[in-house]
């Protein structure tokens, strides 16, 4: 509908009675304005009347103008919102870019679960022997390529897997070594893995299920000699009870036998007795009179345990690894928070606020600043503050303070906080801001001194500057204490601990704080109004009224911190963290004002849980370091150092469970590599690698994907008959061929010799382990796909991507009839040099393995300890006085 503009001509066909009606309506409206008492009746008449109303153009236009104004306002509002969201989005993008170098963390529950899920390795029971090889039946082929009914047994690789793409055989051995390290058992108890030999005459047992399966398959093979069958029927365990020894028969490849013999002779289990369990409990927990520990159980002589690997500071992650250190401290903080006890029987929030209101005489005052004293005080905040302080100190996590300068009560509570918590625990910017607020709001005004103008970047903190300027002994004395409040580094039971000052531990420092506060409240505040002075005095009065409770709170804080600290096994290195834990000063006020008289101490079960999680993480950390160091050494020996280094370090971090590896900056990765490279290799891991290194050729021979070399010729060579495969392009020896070492060729890059030989029509043998692929299609052989090998050498000068094709043409191949029916002699320009795998010989593969008849490995030593506490109200601190004296 189009609206008319102002002064537009009215419609001429309006009826007279309509105009009269309009006049009457106008009259009614004017009457209603004059006589308000009759407004309701006229309104009801208007609503109920049948008469129609006509709205004039002028009125329409006014409405439209209003709508336009409104819409303009709304559009401008929307535009502002769009701009705001754009700015916020840009900030988010910038934040995300920043986050790439600062690690982000998962929800707290998941980190806690990851930590608690790290269990000692011995919990995984070994059910089978370690094996690289397994015997397989392979068919035999006649001279014409047809398969015989007979089979022959060979040792083949159990996991014969090479990844696709450009691949070096040496990487296969590095992965094999990694796999051996992962599966390497800490102990082997053959009795636990032994299974029944189905073919035994007298229900004998063999060492494991795989040995039983091999025996079963050989027993059922028609070509097995009768003497072997009789031997299998006699296979059983031999027990020497007097020596607590049992011998089990096993079927193993000689290399596998060497591995398992090594594992049996180098087991990590040690005898377990009550003394070991007693000494396993942290000494400070044993000597703490608040905990009553009992060991009722007498352990059997066969009890064993695996000593946790608790070496200290081999990588020094606190030094120059900001992201890694931040992640470790965060996970430690979350774990510590979960074990700090909850405060009990806090003073009723309502009652305390009412009492504070009375002390402040708020009813008689209208000063806004004093009503702020009561904001944010609640029991939840008090409990949260208690947990945050202890957990941050246990994990050495840096804190930042959040406060409002006009809330004097927060600042006075902050004075207590700075008294009991060492300065190092706060990020410097936050510490300086808080100290400056205390000085310019409370201390300097009290003595009529001018405001402190602090220069950013000043090496001295505001309190250090103030200590030199203030003449009052008590205040200067308190400032001196705060400025020198640092952790003492003490080594206890081989672990570096960050210990609080003795004056804090026994609570005496609170008297020093109160003396300073009372001196401040007595000052005249000469440059400030009376109301200001009164507000500060009342804030100090509120805190000083709770002197006894504050002493108790300080003692309680110190006791819980030190008791839980006894359960930490890694050195407590102090270093500022990338991210911080926020602490509201109002929550500190809540803690100071609501702390009751109930003593809370960690339960023994909580302490043991905290200790176990710390031990398991620390032990796993050291074991993973040993693995990483061993693999770095192996990569170096296999000339893969440059290629694999970053992935080795990434795997190391992943296995520690708590790290988000993708967010760790590269510079820290390479620094970590340099630290790992300097560490010595553990002897067991080195011996295992030497075993693999000595037997590389045997392992290559057993693989269906690794050749020992390739022969390349300019002219085609005939496929030869082989019993194992039929017609194949395999060379079993290199007699008569000119040989070039593949490793030498890759290292020197001198291809002139090989190119000249090929162009002069002389076959050349490249000797060295390299991967190959198998093809049994006759059509692909006709297509001469193997020419690509020649092209790679002559044109591309690339040996690292060399992957020859092994052709197997026999009665199992597709289109074999082409060869058989047409007497076609297939040829190839390449031959794969492949040695025959080791034939399975039952007599040579039968080994007797010896282990203890029985022993029991206990992983949780603290399960034998029953523990209880004295009534918390009677709990005493280090000075043999009750923790909480103000009862």
From Swiss-Prot:
Gene Ontology cellular-component annotations: T=2 icosahedral viral capsid; viral inner capsid; viral nucleocapsid
Region ranges (Hydrophobic): 401-421, 429-449
Subcellular location: Virion
Primary residence: virion
UniProt PTM: Sumoylated with SUMO1 and SUMO2. Sumoylation of viral proteins seems to have a positive role on viral replication.
Positions of the record's site feature: Interaction with the intermediate capsid protein VP6: 231, 235, 846, 848
Keywords: Capsid protein, Inner capsid protein, Repeat, RNA-binding, T=2 icosahedral capsid protein, Ubl conjugation, Virion
GO molecular function terms noted in the UniProt entry: RNA binding
Region (5-fold hub): 1-87
Ranges annotated as biased composition (Basic and acidic residues): 9-27
Transmembrane parts of this sequence: none
Region (Disordered): 1-46
Pfam families: Rota_VP2
Residue spans of biased composition, Polar residues class: 28-44
Subunit structure: Homodecamer; each decamer is made up of two conformers of VP2, called VP2A and VP2B. Interacts with a VP1-VP3 complex. Interacts with the intermediate capsid protein VP6. Interacts with NSP5. Interacts (via N-terminus) with NSP2.
Function: Inner capsid protein that self-assembles to form an icosahedral capsid with a T=2 symmetry, which consists of 120 copies of VP2, with channels at each of its five-fold vertices. This capsid constitutes the innermost concentric layer of the viral mature particle. It encapsidates the polymerase VP1, the capping enzyme VP3 and the genomic dsRNA, thereby defining the core.
Domain notes: The N-terminus binds RNA. It is necessary for encapsidation of VP1 and VP3. The N-termini of 10 VP2 molecules form a cylindrical hub underneath each 5-fold axis of the inner capsid.
UniProt family annotation: Belongs to the rotavirus VP2 family.
Name the UniProt record assigns to this protein: Inner capsid protein VP2
Species of origin: Rotavirus A (isolate RVA/Monkey/United States/TUCH/2003/G3P[24])
């Amino acid at each position: 509908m189009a609206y008319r503009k102002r002064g537009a001509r009215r419609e001429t066909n309006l009826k007279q009675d309509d105009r009269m009606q309009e006049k009457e309506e106008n009259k009614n409206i004017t009457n209603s304005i004059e006589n308000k008492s009759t407004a309701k009746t006229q309104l009801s008449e208007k609503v109920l009347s049948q008469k129609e109303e006509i709205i004039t153009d002028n009125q329409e236009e006014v409405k439209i103008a209003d709508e336009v104004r409104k819409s303009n306002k709304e559009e401008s509002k929307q535009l502002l919102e769009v701009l705001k969201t754009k700015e916020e989005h840009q900030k988010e993008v910038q934040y995300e870019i920043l986050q790439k170098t600062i690690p982000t963390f998962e929800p707290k529950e998941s980190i806690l679960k990851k930590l608690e899920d790290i269990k000692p390795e011995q919990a995984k029971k070994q059910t089978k022997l370690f094996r690289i090889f397994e015997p397989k039946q392979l068919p035999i082929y006649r001279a014409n390529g047809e398969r015989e009914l007979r089979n022959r047994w060979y040792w083949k690789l159990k996991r014969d897997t090479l990844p696709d793409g450009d691949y070096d055989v040496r990487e296969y051995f590095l992965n094999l070594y990694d796999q051996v390290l992962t599966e390497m058992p800490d102990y082997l108890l053959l009795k636990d893995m032994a299974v029944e030999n189905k073919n035994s005459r007298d229900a004998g047992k063999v060492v494991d299920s795989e040995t039983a399966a091999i025996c079963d398959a050989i027993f059922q093979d028609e070509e097995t000699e009768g003497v072997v069958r009789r031997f299998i029927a006699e296979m059983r365990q031999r027990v020497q009870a007097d020596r607590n020894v049992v011998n089990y028969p096993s079927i193993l490849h000689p290399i596998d036998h060497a591995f398992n013999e090594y594992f049996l002779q180098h087991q990590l289990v040690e005898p377990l007795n009550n003394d070991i369990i007693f000494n396993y409990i942290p000494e400070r927990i044993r000597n703490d009179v608040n905990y009553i520990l009992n060991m009722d159980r007498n352990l059997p002589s066969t009890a064993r345990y695996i000593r946790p690997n608790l070496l200290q500071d081999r990588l020094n992650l606190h030094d120059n690894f900001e992201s890694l250190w931040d992640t470790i401290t965060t996970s430690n903080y979350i774990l510590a928070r979960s074990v700090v006890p909850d405060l009990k029987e806090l003073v009723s929030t309502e009652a305390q606020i009412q009492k504070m209101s009375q002390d402040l005489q708020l009813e008689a005052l209208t000063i806004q600043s004093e009503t702020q004293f009561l904001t944010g005080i609640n029991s939840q905040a008090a409990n949260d503050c208690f947990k945050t302080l202890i957990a941050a100190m246990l994990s050495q996590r840096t804190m930042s303070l959040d406060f409002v300068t006009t809330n004097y009560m927060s600042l006075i509570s902050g004075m207590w906080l700075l008294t009991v918590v060492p300065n190092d625990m706060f990020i410097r910017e936050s510490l300086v801001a808080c100290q400056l607020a205390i000085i310019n709001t409370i201390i300097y005004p009290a003595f009529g001194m001018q405001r402190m103008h602090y220069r950013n970047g000043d090496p001295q903190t505001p309190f250090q500057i103030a200590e030199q300027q203030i003449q009052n002994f008590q205040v200067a004395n308190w400032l001196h204490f705060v400025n020198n409040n640092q952790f003492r580094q003490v080594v206890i039971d081989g672990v570096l601990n960050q210990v609080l000052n003795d004056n804090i531990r026994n609570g005496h420092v609170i008297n020093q704080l109160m003396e300073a506060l009372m001196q401040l409240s007595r000052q005249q505040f000469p440059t400030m109004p009376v109301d200001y002075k009164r507000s500060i005095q009342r804030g100090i009065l509120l805190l000083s009224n709770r002197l006894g409770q504050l002493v108790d709170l300080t003692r309680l804080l110190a006791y819980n911190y030190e008791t839980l600290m006894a359960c930490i096994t890694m050195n407590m290195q102090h270093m500022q963290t990338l991210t911080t834990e926020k602490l509201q000063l109002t929550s500190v006020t809540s803690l100071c004002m609501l702390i009751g008289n109930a003593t809370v101490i960690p339960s023994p079960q909580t302490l043991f849980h905290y200790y176990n999680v710390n031990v398991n993480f620390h032990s796993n950390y050291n074991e993973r370091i040993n693995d990483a160091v061993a693999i770095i050494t192996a990569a170096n020996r296999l000339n893969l150092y440059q290629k694999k280094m970053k992935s080795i370090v990434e795997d190391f971090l992943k296995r520690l469970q708590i790290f988000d590896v993708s967010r760790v900056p590269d510079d820290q990765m390479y620094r970590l590599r340099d630290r790992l490279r300097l560490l010595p290799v553990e002897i067991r891991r080195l011996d295992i690698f030497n075993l693999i290194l000595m037997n590389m050729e045997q392992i290559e021979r057993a693989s269906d994907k690794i050749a020992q070399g390739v022969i390349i010729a300019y002219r085609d060579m005939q496929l030869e008959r082989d019993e194992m495969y039929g017609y194949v392009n395999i060379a079993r020896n290199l007699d008569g061929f000119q040989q070039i070492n593949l490793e030498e060729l890759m290292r020197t890059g001198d291809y002139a010799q090989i190119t000249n030989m090929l162009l002069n029509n002389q076959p050349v043998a490249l000797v060295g382990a390299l991967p190959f692929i198998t093809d049994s299609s006759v059509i692909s052989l006709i297509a001469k796909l193997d020419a690509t090998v020649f092209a790679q050498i002559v044109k591309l000068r690339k040996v690292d991507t060399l992957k020859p094709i092994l052709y197997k043409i026999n009665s199992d191949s597709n289109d074999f009839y082409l060869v058989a029916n047409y007497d076609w002699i297939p040829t190839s320009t390449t031959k794969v040099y492949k040695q025959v795998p080791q034939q399975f010989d039952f007599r040579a593969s039968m080994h007797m393995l010896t282990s203890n008849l029985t022993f029991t490995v206990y992983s949780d030593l603290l399960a034998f300890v029953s523990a209880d506490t004295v009534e918390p109200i009677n709990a005493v601190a280090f000075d043999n006085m009750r923790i909480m004296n103000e009862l």
